[in-house]
Amino acid sequence: MRALNSRLVLIDINSSWQASRRLISATATAFSSDSSSSFRRTRGARQRIASSKSPASSPSPVRRPSDGFSFDVRSPSSDSSISSRKSPTTAPPTVELDAFLEILPPATRKELVKHEAIEELIEVVMDLGRKPLARFPSGDWVISEQPVTHQDLELAVSKVGDFSDDNRSGIDRSLHRISAIRNRKLQVIGLTCRVGRVVSGSAEIIRDLIEGGGSILVIGSPGVGKTTLIREIARMLADEHRKRVVIVDTSNEIGGDGDVPHSGIGRARRMQVPNVNLQHDVMIEAVENHMPETIIIDEIGTELEALAASTIAQRGVQLVATAHGMTIDNIIKNPSLQILIGGIESVTLGDEEARKRKVQKTILERKGPPTFTCAVEMISRTECRVHQRLDVTVDAILAGKSAPFEIRQIRGEDDVPHKLVTPIPLENLEEEPAPLLNRDFVSELLSDDEDEDFLLIRSNKARSNTYTSPRSSPVHVYTYNVLEADLLQVAEVMGLDDEIEVTDDVGEADVILASSSELKQNSSIRRVAKLHKLPIFVIKSTTMAQMVKAVRMILGRESFGSAPKAIEKSSVDDIEIKDDAPESKPSLEELDALEEVRLAIEYIVIPGGEPVELLPRRSDIIVRQLELVESYQLAVENLGTHLNPRLQILPRRSTKKTLTSSSPQKSADGSMGTTGTRLPFLKD
């Protein structure tokens, strides 16, 4: 206490920077030169440097807390003044903000304290010759119009610890991180001073994963809160679950700077890394020497560290680690970190296996089990994507499918003393409406999540509940990576050219026809389709058979010659196009026979206009061949005998609904098979 203007002012030392803001302006001005704390660390022969140029005649010293003092948000009853300020909904973060502000120049500190969002400060950037910046969740804020000088940087450097090989330092027994930028002469010309926080309850969003005992990989961009999350995970495992937790703290960011770890990690032990290039050695040493049940690792970034993490996982130790990247897909594409998800290898499949999977013969597969059992993608400090099984997610991504995940958010409510964790079901997620796209813009955004040869993804159409074929007006088709001429020529061959019309405007289209070869890793076309309520037809190739099936399904026909079947738009299930092969598992002889028909039609009959005689087959296989020929609407003759039947495919259009080998009919000229005019052929 001291007398000011004949009044008594009681000062709260623990939050002097906050109290001074609540006083009247005259009192704050008179007290500003004396209320700042003097947190300094002494290492070796380092001398204490005054934080401001105050005159020699100073008031009597005020008793201050020790350098390592910090209040624990999990024990609100320990300090009545802190409890009185605590919000009833969320626990305030542990921030030694006095110690952080002390390293700043006096003028910068004075201006920064006046900011209304000082409690949400993220970091302060000081570059030589530039204005100092303060970064808040709302954006950057210029602290002072005066540029940073060499003296300002030297003052800040003198109040922090020694910088490590990666140019990082900190304040003793605090979580703040100070990173330096040096010139060619190794002189400090810039500082990034990041505020470290212990946010109690930040790990509640993934409590089920923590209690499950599996290894957790936390992925996110810099500054999204990965370190804060794993620090709270370490405390929960050590204090609540009574596990032996060892933290491999490379940059002293998890446990704070200095030899005594910060209280924010609870009972967990902390191992410092003398050389950042030897982090993998310290990881192995922690397992061999200290018998941990859980190891916490921050920033796995090299192949050696990834290999060490994989080794630790095979020894039965739970791992919790972070890695830089927006999604798991970034980890898969990072050659140094691929081992964390099991590694990637190229596999060549046999013909039968490739047909069974309906994929090409050379594919990418996961090499082995992933190091981590689950993964958390940090979207923001209050939202994340959770992958319960990392192996399933990786397999889905490699197969070109949509990876299963769950989105979780932290939502605060007034009547609840803690933050609520609210899982959001995937089916209830609403995608952002996408803008109306033109053809050039769509070409940059399309993706493919399916591995079927032909898959229809339908959504409700506002204009009508159903559509049938034939229609009074033609179906407008928007094509992507499918030649309009090919589609129109196929429709003309089928005699349906009056029922299909190609358009370049998505807004006028009734359906979208796209090639799956261009639909990779992006769902923008699906958002466009959902916005306009359009069904999407995805064909894997632009072969004759695929185009014919596309036209049939676009017009709502189950098969040629049958009555049109309406496609109910209100249905929530996707319509999957059946393969040409039979539903039962075919034999190798059947596969060879069907492949013989396909090759004959697509490479000889249609392009060259020549008939092709097939090899003799069993009667049941002949039936399968006839069904396949019918899908191309071509005529066929039976040239064999009853005991040795064989077919000949003719380059003429079939007019029969069905054709069987037991009931051939003669044409007007006496030849076997059906008659029809010669068809125009598709271009090669």
UniProtKB/Swiss-Prot annotation:
Keyword Transit peptide (UniProt): yes
One cellular component term from this protein's GO annotations in UniProt: chloroplast membrane
GO biological process, one term: seed maturation
Topology in membrane: Peripheral membrane protein
Keywords, ordered alphabetically: ATP-binding, Chloroplast, Developmental protein, Membrane, Nucleotide-binding, Plastid, Transit peptide
Pfam families: Spore_III_AA (PF19568)
Coiled coil: none
GO molecular function: ATP binding; ATP hydrolysis activity
Chain residue ranges for the region called Disordered: 33-91, 651-684
Knockout consequences: Albino seedlings with defects in etioplast and amyloplast development leading to degenerate organelle-like structures, but normal green vegetative tissues. Reduced hypocotyl gravitropism probably due to the lack of amyloplasts.
SUPFAM superfamilies in the cross-refs: P-loop containing nucleoside triphosphate hydrolases
PANTHER family referenced in this protein's UniProt entry, alphabetically: KINASE-RELATED, PROTEIN SEEDLING PLASTID DEVELOPMENT 1
Function description: Required during eoplast (a highly reduced plastid type present during the degreening and dehydration stages of seed maturation) development in embryos and early stages of eoplast redifferentiation during seedling growth.
Family: Belongs to the ycf45 family.
Protein name stated in the entry: Protein SEEDLING PLASTID DEVELOPMENT 1
Gene field: SPD1
